[in-house]
């Protein structure tokens, strides 16, 4: 039976899990790690790198290394905030103001969905190898506060990666599935999910297989990246003050600062202070410049105080919408690596009045919950009822640029609701339906999801025609809207695919390209692996002949050195056939040397102290 996997497509890291033997299990990637950096890079030779290997080369290739892409997915450029400040790569827009990521190495612009699709593809390929069968179906998580465009864009990313996305599930809800899977007694839990790029708070009733979301709130412009940025800005300011040089204008330096800031943030979760040392961060006519700074936890908390304070608002909103007080919360579940920050844990404890539950791994809990939901859809998990909600209100634009809500936020999904509207002028032949998402009173302040037109309305005085507008949200939280003239029976519908996501034709084209390039990508990956293996063999062989210099002849040493030099040259020239050939030769030579040294050592050990040889085959009479 085909496996359905659960995927936490994160801003910083991604995780994939599956139900095995009735238990959710995290699948390690090809490198043996349980989390995969959500990083994609393209080298000057146009090789594609994904995950840890892409992250490692980011400093040397900042303009072609794409990270934290989740912060751009499903958004237009005017919806972005500080996200643009911390990117070492160039963020552009197309003619429709959709976000595009520039890749100089390929002379190409990517949609964020395409980059996310590469991360998904790696996760799925590694999972397929681990499970011994092809994975084609998945449940993918999104922040609870993602709007319709962002959800649809995430689904598109899955499709581009060759996946049938069975369900889009909210991250806090997935976390609750993981936490409450074996809970029999009813509990009211607050899920505090602070990830790399987004922040969600959900309140749920959990118990005996029923998971009901009471409310959700959040901030899609707040995450661990913002805490890193505070340290980066401080380092730039301090270095400018000390040296008179603005490191923020140097992409390579900015990438090094970002990595150092993330490392310092993580260290300050367990240490009172840490040092940031970046030698040769830049240079001037007087020579190289080094950055050396000490940062204390108190200083870090001072720099990030406004971010910490922002975490309070969604918590209060979620409690208010659920009509609960902090005293009604039985457990607090922390999700996301950023919840390891001590100041965040202290804030949660102060607001709710109890210590957070530490029984779940904040990095893996969402993927594990997604695997449970995948198990439900595959029929492997029984007796689970999940009642999720829509995070933001949905409605249409009415006369005067006002948003009229049809579905209120925190309504349980799937759901279907309708309202009757009419014409604004006499003999109006058509109406334009402008679909909106948000909580503000006026159209201009809310997110536009799309427009469509209903034609063929019978001539009549204004206010007479009856136009029924029906909103239908599916279990993925994705919206369809239908308008119907009750007089003529004519109707028009639209599935909201997100105003800032890729058109359907473009998605289909990218899916086809991905399928066509699958073998090419696999071949390129094999070539990279071959070069890495060959490089490792050169290193090991060099070490061995240095260690065994007294035990092997000069001719053997020269032969090995000649093969090592030839192999290194072949690696530089990307001559893969030659790499294979020389690699095999070098392996054989090193194996023979190993046998020879081992045999010689055995003979030495079998000699007596006076130099005579013991006949090990002789028997005493």
From Swiss-Prot:
Keywords: ATP-binding, Chaperone, Chloroplast, Nucleotide-binding, Plastid
Disordered: annotated segments: 597-621
InterPro entries the UniProt entry points to: ATPase_NBD, Chaperone_DnaK, Heat_shock_70_CS, HSP70_C_sf, HSP70_peptide-bd_sf, Hsp_70_fam
Gene Ontology cellular component list: chloroplast
Subcellular location: Plastid, Chloroplast
Any GO molecular function: ATP binding
Similarity section: Belongs to the heat shock protein 70 family.
Known function: Acts as a chaperone.
The protein, known as: Chaperone protein dnaK
Organism whose genome encodes this protein: Gracilaria tenuistipitata var. liui
Gene label: dnaK
